[in-house]
């Protein structure tokens, strides 16, 4: 037990001794590290000091070199400036010497000029004195003052100038007229040669061929019902005579004539000919004709190269195919006028597009002149304005018969083209136009009466057939209307023979069995 304690004490002493030895070793190491650190620090300080001194010396040397360089540059610049100043001073001195010399020369010249001016003044005074003496002598000899002589001379000169001016103006005007007439003939001749139209006058009848003569009886119908219905609905005379396999449609209005032709041809093909079927076919023919009218208008614009027209203007153009002026087809005439106006516009150097447009539309008023009062040129101008045509086109339409004043070259071209087309041999017939005008006036008298639904002048104007509205006109009123219309015709129209006025009042009651 005691040994154990002793061993433990010895072990504790050894541990303490070991700790002390270790502490002493560590202390020595720390002291060594510290001394090493101090040494290194001192060494670095010495090296830094040496480096700083070295850099300081280098900086001082560089500064000295820079100062030396700057001093040399300043000295060189100063030397150059001194030399430049010396050169400038020398030039200034030279200029001063030159100016002094010039000044001396100018003074001498001025002195010389003064002397010459004095001499000139003396000579001028002598000339003035001589002139005055001569004028007084002339006045004494002529008995006129200088002002009077001057006025006489100016008057003579003025007369001579006026005479020469008048002669020159007359010569220029004569030459200009000759050139203008020659150029106008060339333009018109060129336009006519380049526009060779083959259309001639229209007539007022149309022949419909029949498959056989038996068809004539079917067209007439029992007691003439079919032919009366067709004539009443279309306003066209059906002439059935001994001509084999043919029926003649006679009427002054080409639209009615065309409706009757289409309806009759459809009835012949269909074979069923009775009043109800006739009404149906006439209605179909009217619709078909409306489409044809639109197509004709579009074809006319395509042929002439006029684009962008309002659809209503195109329809009115198509209606012109079924209008005649002195027997001349108005649509063909309008296309011809458009070509001529465009060609002449190209010849004189203006835009042919506007001239062609105005030429094509110039007779558009004839498409509605049966329904609207006034000259067709003014009506056409109002229609074109309504559908937003340009002011140039509108005025050209209105001015082509002198109803409006000319405002542009296009107005004159359209009038000239219209006259050329109308004057072409075979284009128009005066007697046919007078006949159509009489029939139109006959229908117009009937249409002015209240309650008239539609009216037709048939039998070459020997009969006026009037359809009235049954709800507005009774039987007694129909008789009174017939008498009034007869009276108006006798007062307003001149006509051969007599005219039959036929007022028709028809009432229909329709019901459907279901």
Curated annotation (Swiss-Prot):
Tree of life domain: Bacteria
E.C. number: 3.1.-.-
Keywords tagged on the record: Cell membrane, Endonuclease, Hydrolase, Membrane, Nuclease, RNA-binding, Transmembrane, Transmembrane helix
GO biological process: mRNA catabolic process
GO molecular function (one): RNA endonuclease activity
TM ranges: 3-23
Annotated compartments: Cell membrane
A Pfam family the protein falls into: HD
Stated name of the protein: Ribonuclease Y
Originating organism: Clostridium kluyveri (strain ATCC 8527 / DSM 555 / NBRC 12016 / NCIMB 10680 / K1)
């Amino acid at each position: 037990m005691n040994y154990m304690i002793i061993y433990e004490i010895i072990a504790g002493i050894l541990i303490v001794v070991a700790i002390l030895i270790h502490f002493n070793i560590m202390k020595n190491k720390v002291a060594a590290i510290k001394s090493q650190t101090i040494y290194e620090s001192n060494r670095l300080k010495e090296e830094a000091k040496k480096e700083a001194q070295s850099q300081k010396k280098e900086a001082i040397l560089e500064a000295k070199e820079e100062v030396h360089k700057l001093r040399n540059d300043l000295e060189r610049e100063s030397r150059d400036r001194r030399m430049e100043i010396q050169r400038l001073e020398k030039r200034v001195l030279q200029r001063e010497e030159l100016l002094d010399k010039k000044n001396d020369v100018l003074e001498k010249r001025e002195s010389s000029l003064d002397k010459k001016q004095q001499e000139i003044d003396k000579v001028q005074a002598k000339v003035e004195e001589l002139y005055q003496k001569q004028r007084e002598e002339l006045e004494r000899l002529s008995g006129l003052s200088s002002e009077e002589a001057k006025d006489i001379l100016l008057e003579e000169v003025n007369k001579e100038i006026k005479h020469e001016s008048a002669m020159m103006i007359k010569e220029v005007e004569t030459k200009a007229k000759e050139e203008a007439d020659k150029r106008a003939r060339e333009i018109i001749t060129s336009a006519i040669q380049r526009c060779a139209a083959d259309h001639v006058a229209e007539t007022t009848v149309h022949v419909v061929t029949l498959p056989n003569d038996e068809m004539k009886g079917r067209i007439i119908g029992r007691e003439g019902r079919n032919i009366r219905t067709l004539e009443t609905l279309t306003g066209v005379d059906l002439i059935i005579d001994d001509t084999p396999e043919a029926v003649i449609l006679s009427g002054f209005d080409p639209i009615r004539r065309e409706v009757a032709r289409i309806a009759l041809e459809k009835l012949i093909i269909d074979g069923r000919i009775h009043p109800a079927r006739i009404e149906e076919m006439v209605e179909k023919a009217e619709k078909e004709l409306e489409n044809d009218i639109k197509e004709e208008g579009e074809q006319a614009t395509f042929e002439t190269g006029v684009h962008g027209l309002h659809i209503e203007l195109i329809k009115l153009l198509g209606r012109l195919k079924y209008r005649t002026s002195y027997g001349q087809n108005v649509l063909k005439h309008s296309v011809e006028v458009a070509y001529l106006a465009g060609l002449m516009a190209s010849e004189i150097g203006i835009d042919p597009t506007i001239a062609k447009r105005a030429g094509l539309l110039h007779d558009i008023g004839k498409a509605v002149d049966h329904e609207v009062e006034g000259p067709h040129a003014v009506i056409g101008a109002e229609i074109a304005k309504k559908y937003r045509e340009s002011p140039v086109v509108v005025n050209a339409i209105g001015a082509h018969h002198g109803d409006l004043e000319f405002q542009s070259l296009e107005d004159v071209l359209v009038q000239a083209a219209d006259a050329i087309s109308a004057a072409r041999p075979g284009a128009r017939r005066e007697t046919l136009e007078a006949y159509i005008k009489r029939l139109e006036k006959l229908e117009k008298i009937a249409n002015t009466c209240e309650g008239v639904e539609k009216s037709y002048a048939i039998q070459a104007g020997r009969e006026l057939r009037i359809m009235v509205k049954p709800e507005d006109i009774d039987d007694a009123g129909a008789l009174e209307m017939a008498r009034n219309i007869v009276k108006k015709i006798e007062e307003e129209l001149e006509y051969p023979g007599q005219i039959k006025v036929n007022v028709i009042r028809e009432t229909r009651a329709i019901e459907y069995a279901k």
